[in-house]
Regions:
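Positively charged, polar, low-complexity stretches
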Residues: 2-7, 11-15, 19, 23, ...
């Protein structure tokens, strides 16, 4: 079981959420997962993740926060 890396990007203005999550995913190892918290859906981020070998799953919480779980595709 790997690490869970939390990126709380709530309240941050672009491009800071993107920069923070890209720093976190670049530090991931096999089995690690990044959990990103955000108030808006980051469509540009999804495209970058897809192109670079990551899978992502987004859950919409009742409080308006999105939980985005990011893993390496081969992990």
């Amino acid at each position: 079981m790997g690490r869970e890396i939390l990126v709380d990007a709530r309240g941050l203005e672009p491009p800071e959420p993107f920069e923070k999550v890209m720093d976190a995913v670049s530090d991931m190892g096999p089995g690690d997962m990044v959990l990103m918290l955000l108030e808006r859906e980051p469509h540009p981020l999804y495209r970058v993740l897809d192109r670079n070998g990551y899978e992502h799953h987004t859950t919409f919480r009742d409080d308006g926060v999105l939980e985005i779980r990011i893993r390496l595709k081969h992990a």
